[in-house]
């Protein structure tokens, strides 16, 4: 814990210095520009899709961007020679970006709808969805030396995490097999936050528990990939 607090402070400083915080504010303004001109009756329909897009930007691309900034500045390899443990490093990164994503989502929803939405499913959907996208973005960026190479390969995990839930939620293909994609649950929660779907008790349990289980697995994968592509290449092992 004594190492985590300075790590959080440093991560927030880096987010400001690298302009990711500014980019998050800009993305929020873009979503407002999309939603506010819509008729009031259409805003709750569009809002879950908008928030999923925000999760993809802040969750997936921002964390990948921070990794490549650290690679460029040669700081990510130096982490292994400090007392900071991997879990503390990852927790600091996830916490700061998660807080940014949640702040943008709540502000956008409140400006667009006032208090005419359900806060609890909104927060749960954003937190769980962003956490999943952060872990996928972090893990997928580690093997690549340049952001250009990562962008080309990132299309695959991004499409897997986003396209099937959107297809299911929109009713284009409501096949139960799509529940295997962990971001399906957060999207259902976002739909419930704006009264677009009514969730059965089992769906609520699925939407909360399954993403957490998948996030735990992604954390272990992130640690393994960090050891292979960062620790070993730094010459420590």
UniProtKB/Swiss-Prot annotation:
Query: Domain of life, per the record?
Result: Bacteria
Q: Which residues form a coiled coil?
A: none
Cellular localisation: Cell membrane
Give any Gene Ontology cellular component.
plasma membrane
Query: Do the record's keywords include Manganese?
Result: no
Q: Keyword check for Cell membrane, yes or no.
A: yes
Q: Please provide the record's keywords in A-Z order.
A: Antibiotic resistance, Cell membrane, Membrane, Transmembrane, Transmembrane helix, Transport
Annotated GO molecular function terms are: efflux transmembrane transporter activity
Please give the biological process terms from Gene Ontology that the record holds.
response to antibiotic; transmembrane transport
One Pfam short name: FLQE3_permease
Q: Which residues cross the membrane?
A: 20-40, 49-69, 96-116, 119-139, 147-167, 199-219
Give the principal location in a single coarse category. membrane
List S-S links within the chain: none
Query: What is its membrane topology?
Result: Multi-pass membrane protein
Entry function: Part of the ABC transporter complex Rv2686c/Rv2687c/Rv2688c involved in fluoroquinolones export. Confers resistance to ciprofloxacin and, to a lesser extent, norfloxacin, moxifloxacin and sparfloxacin. Probably responsible for the translocation of the substrate across the membrane.
Describe its partners and assembly state. Answer: The complex is composed of 2 ATP-binding proteins (Rv2688c) and 2 transmembrane proteins (Rv2686c and Rv2687c).
What is the protein name given in its UniProt record? Fluoroquinolones export permease protein Rv2687c
Q: What is the native source organism of this protein?
A: Mycobacterium tuberculosis (strain ATCC 25618 / H37Rv)
